[in-house]
A protein has these predicted regions:
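Residue-level marker for isolated small/hydroxyl-bearing positions within beta-strands
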Residues: 5, 76, 165-167, 235, ...
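Short Ser/Thr-interspersed hydrophobic loop/turn segments at strand-loop and sheet-helix junctions
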Residues: 7-9
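Conserved redox-cofactor binding core of oxidoreductases
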Residues: 12
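Outer-membrane beta-barrel transmembrane strands
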Residues: 145-149
């Protein structure tokens, strides 16, 4: 079986141009590898108006939930919720909010897994943060880059904990009517005048509930790496790589490389010694929006280097 996430509908911010659920966008798809046919799908944000595509990691694991062994797929949704699905049939098990700033919906229906405002009889959905051609500029959280976007996530199979790291912030959204022949971003304007922070979050996979949400001073694009030795690594855009305790997410060690970090950390061993390495440098992605809220990142030096650390 192949499991993968799909992108957002377009135009991204004008759902009136594309009424309906817009299947199979913003979804996890299960595809039979032999036939190429879709076995099941689960859509996270029908008729999406916020650019919450779900192309991030689809984690598969076996775990006991309420005393019952389950074959599970876990996913840090870009919309700010961690979803637990039955990977054999796509049925919804649970969802938990894993980021502080979230207002686009008032919650997830515990039976269906859909946003509580979702009405299948309507072609145009109105979630808690109303964004359409008639609405004024609205603050929407999470930001269009999500709480966790395409950044790698990780989990510890012995402790049954999943980890995600990303962005904690909001966007200001004003919808314009889409017109044929317009530019790629036609249909919406998204800016960020507020400060953009980050987060690292831990989920108990046996319950689907959040263990810890730790706010970070800067956004994360590098994802997260969990080790068998009780450490979790991530790196923020200011150039700081940090090792956290894998239970409490208390920071244990950090090092600033002097330039931005967007690449994921990796781990390997040589001669019985474990190392963590990551590529650093380059520009800040989507820099206009991110730098507007964190202007001190303008002073970061450029460059491209490989940093390697030994775990003693």
């Amino acid at each position: 079986m192949l499991y993968y996430g799909t992108g957002q509908p377009v135009p991204m911010y004008d759902p009136e141009y594309r009424p309906g659920d817009n299947l199979y966008t913003n979804s996890t798809l299960a595809i039979d590898a032999d036939t190429g046919k879709m076995v099941w799908y689960f859509q996270y944000t029908p008729n999406d108006a916020y650019d919450y595509d779900e192309v991030g990691s689809q984690m598969i694991y076996d775990v006991t939930i309420n005393g019952e062994p389950r074959k599970v797929l876990g996913h840090f949704g870009r919309n700010g919720f961690y979803y637990t699905l039955d990977r054999t049939n796509g049925s919804f098990i649970s969802a938990a909010q894993y980021v502080k700033n979230l207002n686009w919906t008032k919650g997830i229906d515990p039976k269906t897994g859909k946003p509580v405002e979702y009405d299948p009889s309507k072609k145009l959905q109105q979630y808690a943060a109303v964004s359409n051609r008639k609405s004024d500029q609205v603050d929407v959280c999470p930001d269009l880059q999500g709480a966790v976007s395409f950044f790698p996530t990780s989990y510890n199979p012995s402790k049954h904990i999943a980890y995600g790291a990303g962005i904690d912030g909001c966007m200001q959204l004003k919808v314009d009517e889409t017109r044929m022949g317009g530019p790629f971003w036609n249909g919406g304007i998204a800016t960020r005048n507020n400060r953009m922070g980050g987060h690292i979050s831990a989920i108990d996979m046996t319950t689907g509930k959040v263990k810890v949400i730790r706010p970070l001073d800067y956004p994360v694009y590098s994802g997260v790496l969990a080790t068998a030795g009780g450490l979790v690594f991530t790196a923020t855009l200011d150039g700081t790589i940090t090792a956290f305790d894998d239970e409490s997410l208390e920071p244990l060690w950090s090092f600033n490389v002097g330039t931005s970090i967007c690449a994921p950390p990796m781990s390997y061993s040589v001669g019985g010694k474990q190392f963590v390495a990551l590529h650093v440098g380059g520009g800040v992605p989507w820099n206009i929006g991110v730098l507007k809220g964190t202007p001190e990142l303008h002073t970061l030096e450029g460059g491209s280097s490989l940093f390697v650390f030994a775990l003693d």
